[in-house]
């Protein structure tokens, strides 16, 4: 029987460490972890191939490049809709930080993974998981405000973003 882990009870640092541990398990020893303190929006980075499908081999679901992993822990969980709203705001702020002219984030990733304890609805199209994924695709391709329409996260090199949500993180633990 599957067990639910109360991930919201972890300290912020412990949740970041869990994020790094999961990255090491999934991606291997090429993961570079960052310690406490300012991390430029990165808990860990990885450069290389990422196969998201354990059954199909390296293919359409695969990534190959510079990946940033970020932990997004919600201390008090709400309804799936509240959790989705919170996570949409968190992810949007991260994209805004990468786009800021005065950003101190350094190298823009080709891929980004948001690891969160937020439990989201899996209802097709309307659920939080699909909302986050659609928002990520839209933000990556959307023109930067005030640009001539040619500047976007995609134009700067970001190819995809993925969320590992509460129910998935709990299964991986």
Protein language model annotation of sequence segments:
Residues 1-173:
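Mixed-charge (Asp/Glu-Lys/Arg
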């Amino acid at each position: 029987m599957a067990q639910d882990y109360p991930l919201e009870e972890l300290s912020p640092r412990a949740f970041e460490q869990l994020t790094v541990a999961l990255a090491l398990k999934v991606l291997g020893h090429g993961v570079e972890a960052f310690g406490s303190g300012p991390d430029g929006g990165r808990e860990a980075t990885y450069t290389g191939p990422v196969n998201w499908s354990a059954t199909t081999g390296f293919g359409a679901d695969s990534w190959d490049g510079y990946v940033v992993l970020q932990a997004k822990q919600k201390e008090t969980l709400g309804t799936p809709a509240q959790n989705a709203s919170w996570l949409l705001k968190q992810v949007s702020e991260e994209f805004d930080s990468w786009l800021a002219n005065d950003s101190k984030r350094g190298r823009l990733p080709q891929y980004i993974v948001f690891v969160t304890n937020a439990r989201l609805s899996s209802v097709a199209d309307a659920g939080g998981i699909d909302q986050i994924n659609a928002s990520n695709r839209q933000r990556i391709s959307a023109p930067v405000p005030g640009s001539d329409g040619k500047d976007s996260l995609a134009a700067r090199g970001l190819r995809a973003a993925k969320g590992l949500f509460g129910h998935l993180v709990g299964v991986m633990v």
